[in-house]
Amino acid sequence: MYYGFDIGGTKIALGVFDSTRRLQWEKRVPTPHTSYSAFLDAVCELVEEADQRFGVKGSVGIGIPGMPETEDGTLYAANVPAASGKPLRADLSARLDRDVRLDNDANCFALSEAWDDEFTQYPLVMGLILGTGVGGGLVLNGKPITGQSYITGEFGHMRLPVDALTLMGFDFPLRRCGCGQMGCIENYLSGRGFAWLYQHYYHQSLQAPEIIALWEQGDEQAHAHVERYLDLLAVCLGNILTIVDPDLLVIGGGLSNFTAITTQLAERLPRHLLPVARAPRIERARHGDAGGRRGAAFLHLTD
């Protein structure tokens, strides 16, 4: 059995998957905020409960935001303060007496989608998350590409290309990102960026779901906004796809529920790619909130 954990600032979620990659059991508990000992206990107790339930010693994979293992072997995860700065992988491996694997939660999302029954035919899969931020991951032949710093797929921290400024106007404001850089595309293409763009052009403060509801009602202003957003997304993705050249692009995160993104993006992409380039197949993520757990569990399928 494959045990996959999706760990965030508020919850530790476990999914147990069988050899056919089907979910058999799941459970979640609150994430301890201050005590590392309590954090380890929470994870280990879930593993032990699963072992007893299924009568096997399952493999353990964990998806967590941040850098799963820094140069000194410790975790860096600002949203999980109880475990950040601690040798999480080594401690759990020792306590559970098995190989525990960690990866970035965005990489786990991409891995989950790459191992979908329909998508395993594609050698290079790119996962793109359009949610609170913009991130993603790359999977090549069923294995995540992580890089030495686990920042492969941090697409949101690429800067706006010159074509974006041609589209939006050269007086378009370059916003300072939380990472400290100016003009990161996350500030414009995330759910918050989607809302910020609307406020910037129309001087109305609405959340993304409210804007999308107006678009669905045929509101002309919302329609113009969505067209502008999709054009900007296509410009930025054109740069990324020219580097990555994936066979399949899977879009997740809250904005992926807005079907216009996946249905209309394909029309816009070709003009931003090299003439010889083939645009990837574009799909919405298939596994929703379960994606992080699935991908974490499947870290043990990548040998």
Swiss-Prot record:
Protein name stated in the entry: N-acetyl-D-glucosamine kinase
Function, as annotated: Catalyzes the phosphorylation of N-acetyl-D-glucosamine (GlcNAc) derived from cell-wall degradation, yielding GlcNAc-6-P.
Keywords, comma-separated and alphabetical: ATP-binding, Carbohydrate metabolism, Kinase, Metal-binding, Nucleotide-binding, Transferase, Zinc
Molecular function terms from GO: ATP binding; N-acetylglucosamine kinase activity; zinc ion binding
Organism, as annotated: Salmonella dublin (strain CT_02021853)
InterPro entries per UniProt: ATPase_NBD, N-acetyl-D-glucosamine_kinase, ROK, ROK_cs
Keyword Chloroplast belongs to the record: no
Reactions mediated catalytically: N-acetyl-D-glucosamine + ATP = N-acetyl-D-glucosamine 6-phosphate + ADP + H(+)
Gene (UniProt): nagK
